[in-house]
């Protein structure tokens, strides 16, 4: 019960870092939706992968089911309300920077593929890996367009040419 009393204060402190990174509300929801879909695909593929006698496929399937559980716990804690600490874990994950989430999610998705390279593991972990990629793209942030970049380069080039002309005139 004490964890539910501390949740509002913790969620208020975890909200500013996500907003400071410049993620829009729709991109944040896209990342969360991708995480939930990745968890579902990992769980289904992991169960399918466990129906075999090959031990590496079973290990990869168990890892994929664990990935599904962790993704749901981090991205959609309301799906794991039977676990007492689900909201606490989700709040701690929300405080992580986007690049940390990207490395974590991509790393989790690559391990079963390394264990057993099959079509089931590739397809099952594709959306989970895409979740990490989406968080990685948000870590890069919004970059300027090509036109603005070209203008800045042109201004720098003109400034360099003027400095070169001044130094040449000074030598003469």
Swiss-Prot record:
Give the principal location in a single coarse category.
membrane
UniProt-listed InterPro entries: TVP18/Ca-channel_flower
Membrane-related topology note? Multi-pass membrane protein
Q: What is the organism of origin for this protein?
A: Homo sapiens
Q: Which GO terms describe its cellular component?
A: early endosome; endoplasmic reticulum membrane; Golgi apparatus; plasma membrane; recycling endosome; synaptic vesicle
UniProt lists the family membership as follows: Belongs to the calcium channel flower family.
Q: In which tissues is it expressed?
A: Detected in skin cells at low levels of expression (at protein level).
One Pfam family name from the record? Answer: Cg6151-P
Which residue intervals are topologically Extracellular? Answer: 54-57, 124-125
Role description: Transmembrane protein which mediates synaptic endocytosis and fitness-based cell culling. In response to different stimulus strengths, controls two major modes of synaptic vesicle (SV) retrieval in hippocampal neurons; Clathrin-mediated endocytosis (CME) in response to mild stimulation and activity-dependent bulk endocytosis (ADBE) in response to strong stimulation. In cytotoxic T-lymphoocytes (CTLs) facilitates calcium-dependent endocytosis of cytotoxic granules at the immuno synapse.
How is the quaternary structure described?
Answer: Interacts with adaptor protein complex 2 (AP-2).
Protein's UniProt keywords contain Cytoplasm: no
* Record-annotated disulphide pairs: none
Sorted alphabetically, the keyword list is: Cell membrane, Cytoplasmic vesicle, Endoplasmic reticulum, Endosome, Golgi apparatus, Membrane, Synapse, Transmembrane, Transmembrane helix
Name used for this protein in its record: Calcium channel flower homolog
Q: Which GO terms describe its biological process?
A: vesicle-mediated transport
Q: Does the keyword Ribonucleoprotein apply?
A: no
What more the UniProt record tells us is:
In cancer cells, isoforms 1 and 3 isoforms (usually expressed in 'winner' cells) are up-regulated in cancer tissue whereas isoforms 2 and 4 isoform (usually expressed in 'loser' cells) are up-regulated in tissue adjacent to the cancer, suggesting they might be important for tumor growth.
Chain ranges sitting on the Cytoplasmic side read: 1-32, 79-102, 143-172
Transmembrane stretches in the record are 33-53, 58-78, 103-123, 126-142
């Amino acid at each position: 019960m004490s964890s539910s009393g501390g949740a509002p204060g913790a969620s208020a402190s975890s909200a500013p870092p996500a907003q400071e990174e410049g993620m829009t509300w729709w991109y944040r929801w896209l990342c969360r939706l991708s995480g939930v879909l990745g968890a579902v695909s990992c769980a289904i593929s992991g169960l399918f992968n466990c129906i075999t006698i090959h031990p590496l496929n079973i290990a990869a399937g168990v890892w994929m089911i664990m990935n599904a559980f962790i993704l749901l716990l981090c991205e959609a804690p309301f799906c794991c309300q039977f676990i007492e600490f689900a909201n606490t874990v989700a709040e701690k994950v929300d405080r992580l920077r986007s690049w940390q989430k990207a490395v974590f999610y991509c790393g989790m998705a690559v391990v079963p593929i390394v264990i057993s390279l099959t079509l089931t593991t590739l397809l099952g972990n594709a959306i989970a890996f895409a979740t990490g990629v989406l968080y990685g793209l948000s870590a890069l942030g919004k970059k300027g367009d090509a036109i603005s970049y070209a203008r800045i380069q042109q201004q720098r080039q003109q400034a360099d040419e003027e400095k070169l002309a001044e130094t040449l005139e000074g030598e003469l």
